Amino acid sequence: VSSTLDPADITWENAELIPADGALDAVRALRARDGGDLSIMGSATLARSLIAADLVDELNLMIEPVSLGGGKRLFPDDGSARVFELVSTTRAATGVQICKFRPTGEPLRPGHSDELYEDGKEPVTPS
């Protein structure tokens, strides 16, 4: 997905340039095809749009042990919440946590985040 590249710039095999202004419709069409997975890497803007449109089947987040204090938002700012479940986590030697999440399709319930704490203070470790 790009607003600046030309189709001639794409040299990867089995790659297709999608104009940014039609990205959601193009992703819907690609998901309807037979074939492999679709991966998005490094585009917070596109990821945010796909999450808001419920077009994400899996979210792989790398959590760095660094606080930047700012940056691009990954999650939609549309006022609605999406519930994800942690499927797996791996800790790299550098301290980076690699977390795989999948949407549950469940609505956020009042007090939902409170369920993460058994005693109201310490987080419950997912099994």
Regions flagged by a language model, labelled:
Residues 1-55, 65-127:
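Portal/gating segments that form or line small-molecule/metal binding sites
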